[in-house]
Amino acid sequence: AMPRIVGIGHQDFEQMITSDNFYIDKTMFIKEWWENNDTVTLITRPRRFGKTLNLSMTEHFFSVKHSGRDDLFQNLSIWQEEKYRELQGTYPVIFLSFAGVKETSFPDARKSICQIIENLYNKYDFLLESDHLNEREKKAYKNVSADMDHNLAANSLNTLSDYLMRYYGKKVILLLDEYDT
């Protein structure tokens, strides 16, 4: 067998697990975080500490987008917990990174953030086909763009979470990375 590689700077959990890199199992973070039942958890660690990889792991664990991906977790400690096997892939998860926002002026940074939000909304276009949104909401949904007005931007994540909650009938897990940009 090939020797395992120590991967440095990996940020995507699936890539980390499937590429046979050496991975320090941090999946019990999922249990600890879930059982804390906090409304908001702030994870502050120094640079290069693996925060993004941890968020990616959390997203892969909970997101409906990754339902049925037992293969990513079956050799990790979280999989020993019967209760958590049932939770894998059963929640709507919004994973948003502001890592790309490097603009120095407020208007430019704002536009960049609004663009990230527009891209996020584009991923959930299926909501427009559903009957969970009324016509007014669908119209507002389509107005989310890089140059949307301040009120629409300020409420956009809350609004999207609300739509996803209606669609899936479950609370939304919102993961923000590089929020301090």
Residue ranges and their predicted role:
Residues 177-181:
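Walker B catalytic acidic pair
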Residues 39, 92, 169-173:
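Loop/turn-to-beta-strand initiation segments
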Residues 54-58, 113, 160:
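Structural preference for long, well-ordered alpha-helical segments in enzyme cores
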Residues 9, 14, 60-127:
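P-loop NTPase motor core
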Residues 32-36, 61, 116-120, 160-167:
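Generic, well-ordered alpha-helical scaffold segments in large soluble proteins
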Residues 123-175:
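Mid-core helix/loop region of P-loop NTP-binding domains shared across ATPases and GTPases
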Residues 2-80:
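Walker A/P-loop-proximal flanking segment of P-loop NTPase domains
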Residues 21-22, 105, 109, 113, ...:
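Phosphate/oxyanion-binding active-site loops and adjacent basic polyanion-contact surfaces
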